[in-house]
Amino acid sequence: MVKILLKLLLALLMLGLLQGCGSLFYWPEEGLRGTPDQLGIEYQPVNLKTSNNLNLHAWWFPSRAEEPAKPQGLIYYLHGNAENISTHFMGMTWITNHGWEVFILDYRGYGLSEGKPSIAGVHHDAYMGLKWAIAKAKEQQLPLVVLGQSIGGATAVTLVANARAEEQQQISGLVVDSAFSGYRRIAREKLNESWLTWAFQYPLSWTITDRYSPEKHIKNLPANLPLLFLHSCTDSVIPCSHSQRIYQQAAEPKTYLEAVEGRHIEMLSQLKWRRELVVWLEGL
């Protein structure tokens, strides 16, 4: 019976992996649980279109700071792999009180965005969002910072590293919060956690593309781009060794902040680390 279950599990895993790994890395939630205006937060919906005509849904949040009158800059926020912007936006809109605008995109299949997520598709969506953010920041003559959390952080590294030279010049900083260093590496670690799948960790992980992994692109980031890495060493979802790995490979100027407690992507929910981020942004 155990052998039959193992064979069935292996077949299901192989099927999921060979179909683009979307079900393994992406857990979208369709629709929205609510909108910012229900909480009294000003925002504007933004609609983008992919090269294959998918409609993507996003939100832009203006600065809420009274002084200075002009915003400090624009943060392009790439969220994690689960749910959608209606559950993620509060994780970054606090910074609008410090004078920053925030732009947050839902990848294909998330929220009101059309399509089905895949590694390649999500990276394409992130690039569509980057082009919008660059145009918005340029229009207002504001610095642009790209900030990604979890899989959004992994996406952000590869996104910025592969943007065109003129686009890279418009980016003033990159923040990577609790990201993994490689798709294949994190898949192997997760397969290793269960006795049902540990024996298949290597053969199955090799079916996953590493083309978009941060560790393969970190050295291609623009020269002198300020980098900030954050990770909790008690993160049970993505070990902090992943952030340490890409941090070590990155060029200066770079900063690494590590918490000694807290769960996955919880650092920026704490006042201490929010202050650290604001100080870092002020130094750009």
Where are these regions (language model features)?
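Membrane-embedded segments
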Residues: 51-133, 142, 154
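Glycine-rich nucleophile elbow surrounding the catalytic serine of serine-hydrolase chemistry
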Residues: 148-158
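C-terminal catalytic histidine-bearing segment of alpha/beta-hydrolase fold enzymes
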Residues: 241-284
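Short beta-strand immediately N-terminal to the catalytic nucleophile in serine-hydrolase-like folds
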Residues: 146-148, 177, 230
